[in-house]
Amino acid sequence: MLFLLFLLVAPIYAGLILPTKPSNDPFYNAPAGFEKAAVGEILQSRKTPKPITGVFVPVKIQNSWQLLVRSEDSFGNPNVIVTTVMEPFNADPSKLASYQVFEDSAKADCAPSYALQFGSDVTTIATQVETYLLAPLLDQGYYVVSPDYEGPKSTFTVGKQSGQAVLNSIRAALKSGKITNLAEDAKVVMWGYSGGSLASGWAAALQPNYAPELGGNLLGAALGGFVTNITATAEATDGTVFAGIMANALGGVANEYPEFKQILQNDTDKQSVFDQFDNHCLADGVINYIGKHFLSGTNKIFKSGWNILKNPTISKIVEDNGLVYQKQLVPKIPILIYHGAIDQIVPIVNVKKTYQNWCDAGIASLEFSEDATNGHITETIVGAPVALTWIINRFNGKQTVSGCQHVKRTSNFEYPNIPPSILNYFKAALNILIQKGLGPDIQKDQVNPDGLKKIPILV
């Protein structure tokens, strides 16, 4: 009996020899002279050290690689990113989905290229669970690329760094044919939810000027739980069970802007708390800061409270990283937006403003599918069939909407022509989530803190 148990457990145990974290992995280091390479150039490559994770078991796919890619930060300074390319069985080398995870962290060891590997730390559980969203893309036979778009400084919520990294990741993937067998002229669709939508949205908006040559490859972008104003998310989450998202965001912006970091440091007498903002992944960050007040209340971390946003330096940085303020940046590719009307983490008001900005600017194709009964958490699942249906239609050459179209449905499960297998897949996922003890009002983003603390063992 013990021998049989060993036979069952041994393969799993072998898989749990942990992958090396980015902070200790030389592959992530920029090689000498990398600055001379063009953006999007592959500097080195390797098979992923571990298989792609399915949380408890590896995902069975044909192959996966990591590419070290030349990119640049918000100021045009050269840097490198790692991107992960996944090849399913019976892959179609003419189709590539660029999936941006909601990393939502200011810590290097939370990078998707590490988190997507089987055996990665439990603190990366949010990214690990996102393989549930990746699976239908792979099942369609699409190659999938997922970049470490926050870059080597882990600049969570920094728009330009993120968008440029996504585009340079796509450039690299399209040049990787000798490694991956992906066609250089492959068609590409981008997809991201929440923090991943921020990166995807910035990529779509920057593409006409930053990567115009990709215009012939890109078929569109699906943006869910669309983050266009980081201040609004801070206001919505401060002092709530999701305050950790705000802490991670402050850490991410501080990683890119030293002057931002200095102003925050000078405004707190709780330096030990501030010093930990870049030391959490999404799940442990949320759990660690439940109910914490950073800019509100009598025991806030920053003495100036919300008045700190009136500081001209802070105000400019915040606006520079909010798509809602960038009226001059308008995508030229078709766009799908899906969002929950009762989202308590990313308020829909700024999504509507961005939608209107793009419509007023004459965007060629913008579809907005608004869900009346779901908030940020459950829309991750309920909105996914919308994105997948739209993506499949894009790859199959079906026509997108002409101009702007905004439709509000009771639930995005009602989106037209969702393939039954995809709809059933995500309905089952929603039922599992609701039954996991996070609270009876989870669809309204009202989460039981005790249930939230169980996240690592819920999945």
Swiss-Prot record:
GO terms for molecular function: lipase activity; triacylglycerol lipase activity. It catalyses: a triacylglycerol + H2O = a diacylglycerol + a fatty acid + H(+). Disulfide bonds join C110-C281, C359-C404. It is found in: Secreted. It comes from the Eukaryota. The active site is at S194, D343, H376. Residues 1-14 form the signal peptide. One of its GO terms (cellular component) is extracellular region. GO terms for biological process: lipid catabolic process. Keywords: Disulfide bond, Glycoprotein, Hydrolase, Lipid degradation, Lipid metabolism, Secreted, Signal, Virulence. Induction: Expression is induced in medium containing Tween 40 as the sole source of carbon. Expression is up-regulated during the yeast-to-hyphal transition. Expressed in host cecum and infected mucosal tissues (stomach, hard palate, esophagus and tongue). Expressed more strongly during mucosal infections than during systemic infections. Its main location: secreted. Its EC number is 3.1.1.3. Glycans are attached at N229, N266. It is an enzyme of class 3 (hydrolase). It holds the Pfam family LIP. Belongs to the AB hydrolase superfamily. Lipase family. Class Lip subfamily. PANTHER family: LIPASE 5, PTHR34853. Secreted lipase that is able to hydrolyze both the neutral triacylglycerols and the monopalmitate ester Tween 40, allowing the use of hydrolyzed products as carbon sources. Has broad lipolytic activity, which may be important for colonization and subsequent infection, therefore contributing to the persistence and virulence in human tissue. This is Lipase 4. The lineage of its organism: Eukaryota, Fungi, Dikarya, Ascomycota, Saccharomycotina.
